[in-house]
Amino acid sequence: MDTSKNTLLKFANLPAFEKITSKDMYQAISFLVQENKKIVKKIESLEKLTWKNFIYRMEESDDKIAKAWAPIRHLNSVMNDVKTRNQYEKSLSLLTSHYGKIGQNKKLFNQYQRFYEENKKNLNSSQKKLLADVLQGFKLSGVHLAPKQRKLFRDSQEKLANLESNFEQNILDSTNSWSKNYKTEKILKGMPKNSLEIASEVAAIRKQDGFT
């Protein structure tokens, strides 16, 4: 997978929205999820845990995923063409599945718990809060459930994510399909000139009089 030209994987600056393509979306999320899996695999077997080789690496990896995902969500909301929607839905499905499994990873949970117990005397309040939230997240994700219950929980999470996504897409479709036509400019008094010009152009495209 050649990701060298993927705009979503360049984290030095603010997102370059004008350069992001639909092809970039799932490719970026898939790549970052695979990288996250590799990091988790290494951390599971670490004997000596430090903030730098454990917590920082996990936070950095999760932060990259969040930074790539945020523009995808935004573009899905404001563009919502067929290609963008497909890439968004594929990416959402992958992320939901991945983090559902991460949240139930007992080896990783035990490493977090061990690190906290071994280092809590030397941690500042912010570090303690971060770890407390992470440990609580594992518990809320069903890390202590029996195997069959863990799978049921993950399946329910994925189903809920799909339902939420479908609901959002239906709202966008309804919003995009709705329009109101005004025959005269009088009722639109106060609207900026450029907005009126756009409304007039839309009306003309739809073979309507006035403004849409």
Locate the predicted segments by residue.
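Zn2+-dependent metallopeptidase catalytic domains
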Residues: 1-212
